[in-house]
Amino acid sequence: MALHTVLIMLSLLPMLEAQNPEHANITIGEPITNETLGWLSDKWFFMGAAFRKLEYRQAIQMMQTEFFYLTTNLINDTIELRESQTIGDQCVYNSTHLGFQRENGTFSKYEGGVETFAHLIVLRKHGAFMLAFDLNDEKKRGLSLYAKRPDMTLELREVFQKAVKHVGMDESEIIFVDWKKDKCGQQEKKQLELGKETKKDPEEGQA
């Protein structure tokens, strides 16, 4: 499921802050600093998620893979999101902007007159982060995982599994991404190579 779509469809309530997150090795409610924003400005891979609501689970199953780029703007506190999704045999591109609230550590998306929120959970040690949604609603709650590399370590997998159980869900509800099904990575690589060749041609013509 696309990151911006998740932010539109789900809204967060801070029930998790009332729990003890140490059991899942996660920290809730940390302020978002410029250092964090610099760390987030990178390429990210959607690794998996656990969502209670059926249509959200189905949306994840329809999307084979997703990677995206985050570019932060410190002047107006927004984040540009550029994503590439593999859906079937197609590579689908999309771009949008996210807001963020520094004090309570949340991302936000304003759509159709409604602003929804997701709590950012940084897993810096693992080069990853999670987003938590609707944790007070047993039928809608969800947790998603993103990492800087598509090859997930066993330790990161276990951290996410523990976090999912900690918010009252079951490991069986997790859908992990199979990056062997990615169609967008090769396309991006070809576009980058083509761009390099295009830059070389004018130089060769002047030689």
Swiss-Prot record:
Biological processes annotated in GO: acute-phase response; regulation of immune system process
Residues that carry a glycan: 25, 34, 76, 94, 104
Locations listed in the record: Secreted
Gene name per UniProt: Orm8
GO cellular component, one term: extracellular space
CDD domains for the chain: lipocalin_AGP-like
Note: Eight genes coding for different forms of alpha-1-AGP are present in mus carolis.
Organism of derivation: Mus caroli
Expressing tissues: Expressed by the liver and secreted in plasma.
Highest taxon of source: Eukaryota
Name of protein: Alpha-1-acid glycoprotein 8
Similarity remark: Belongs to the calycin superfamily. Lipocalin family.
Keyword Disulfide bond appears in the UniProt entry: yes
Pfam families: Lipocalin
InterPro entries from the UniProt entry: A1A_glycop, Calycin, Lipocln_cytosolic_FA-bd_dom
Lineage: Eukaryota, Metazoa, Chordata, Craniata, Vertebrata
Signal peptide: 1-18
Record remark on domains: Contains a beta-barrel that binds various ligands in its interior.
SS bond partners: 91-184
Function recorded in the entry: Functions as a transport protein in the blood stream. Binds various ligands in the interior of its beta-barrel domain. Appears to function in modulating the activity of the immune system during the acute-phase reaction.
